[in-house]
Design a protein with these regions (language model features):
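Conserved, structured core segments of small domains
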Residues: 1-108
Length: 108
């Protein structure tokens, strides 16, 4: 069992639970706009939080079981980063999320 992670707003996650699928790519961008959902390994979460979510309120860290994800997951290189990041190429089925933990972003 392998886990990947995604930082989500509480509002976006609540909408996903109602709809049965999560369709936000990253903060302020939808899956339709970006083409995939950004995810991270456990080691990558702090850098993502620091870079994109600094000071953001009402966040959750979604713990995603890769064995349960319906769409394709591709590990892709990001310029300037040593390790590739997992990208989910389609709506994330909420049944793949095994935990939605309260998450505090770094202060601004």
């Amino acid at each position: 069992m392998t886990f990947i992670y995604h930082i989500a707003t509480v509002a976006d996650w609540e909408r996903a639970v109602r709809d049965g699928q999560y369709t936000m790519s990253t903060r302020g961008l939808t899956l339709a706009e970006q083409g995939f959902i950004h995810a991270s390994t456990a080691e990558q979460v702090p850098l993502v939080a620091e870079t994109f979510y600094r000071g953001a309120p009402d966040l959750l860290l979604l713990v995603i079981d890769t064995d349960r994800v319906g769409p394709e997951i591709r590990y892709e290189q990001v310029p300037g980063q040593a390790a590739p990041y997992p990208h989910i190429y389609g709506p994330l089925n909420v049944t793949a999320v095994v935990e939605a933990r309260p998450f505090r972003a770094p202060d601004p």
